[in-house]
A protein has these predicted regions:
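Glycine/threonine-rich helix-loop capping motifs at alpha-helix boundaries
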Residues: 139-148
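Generic structural signal for small/hydrophobic residues in well-ordered secondary structure
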Residues: 3-4, 42, 49, 77, ...
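Structural signature of PLP-dependent enzymes
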Residues: 133-140, 159-182
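Substrate-binding/gating loop at the entrance of the active-site cleft, primarily
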Residues: 1-10
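Active-site PLP attachment segment
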Residues: 96-134
């Protein structure tokens, strides 16, 4: 992986299921590993890939309090944030506190939502001036995956009112598809557990 090739070590903190079968962050494990491994940057996936959890505000706040305590920079992968199933709401990581706003690089793209993968149309939001300048400096040294004219127009077009109208219809269809798929798997696939996602269009199966 590119991170490891650049001398970084990846430390995982697996999710755990609560008494209701809902996947949660293991805050005790997160803090232990941050402290013991001297972690200074964290990748925060919201909504979560692959289990499809759409984090509640208190969960994001608690994670960001840990990152603040140990001065950890946060890369918030929010590429699935448009695809929230009915009954749930995405909370942007940068919105939960002023500190979260300033220590987080939030990453987005229309590729998952509007089927534009491959056009290289991702973008990030950075409020912290110092952090933004560092990212711009490093990215200016390479043209790898730079946006092009086609991807720029595709991104602008996706986020027009017509795109949002289409997305509202898509979310209704996906919600119905998820309901059907989860019921079918539970009824026909003995020994396989399925976690009903709150966002994304993926199903997380425990085989």
């Amino acid at each position: 992986m590119s991170l490891e090739n650049n001398g970084y070590h990846i430390v995982h903190s697996p999710l755990v299921k609560d008494e209701n079968g809902v996947w949660r962050m293991n805050f005790e494990d997160m803090e232990k590993k941050i402290a013991e491994k001297h972690i200074h940057a964290a990748v925060f996936c919201s909504p979560h890939n692959p289990c499809g959890r759409v984090w509640e505000r208190w969960e994001i706040e608690k994670a960001m309090e840990l990152y603040k305590k140990y001065d950890v920079f946060v890369i918030s992968d929010e590429i699935w944030s448009d695809l929230i199933l009915e009954g749930h709401k995405h909370i942007p990581t940068q919105s939960v506190s002023e500190d979260a706003r300033n220590r987080t690089v939030a990453m987005y793209a229309p590729s998952k939502t509007f089927n534009l993968a491959g056009l290289v149309g991702s973008y990030h939001i950075i409020y912290n001036t110092w952090l933004r300048e560092r990212v711009l400096k490093e990215s200016s040294l390479s043209h790898y995956n730079a946006m092009n004219v086609l991807s720029m127009h595709a991104l602008v077009g996706a986020y027009k009112p017509e795109g949002y109208e289409w997305l509202d219809e898509l979310r209704q269809v996906l919600t119905g598809n998820v309901e059907f798929a989860c019921r079918y798997i539970q009824d026909h696939f003995e020994g396989i557990e399925v976690s009903k996602p709150e966002g994304t269009y993926m199903l997380f199966l425990d085989c």
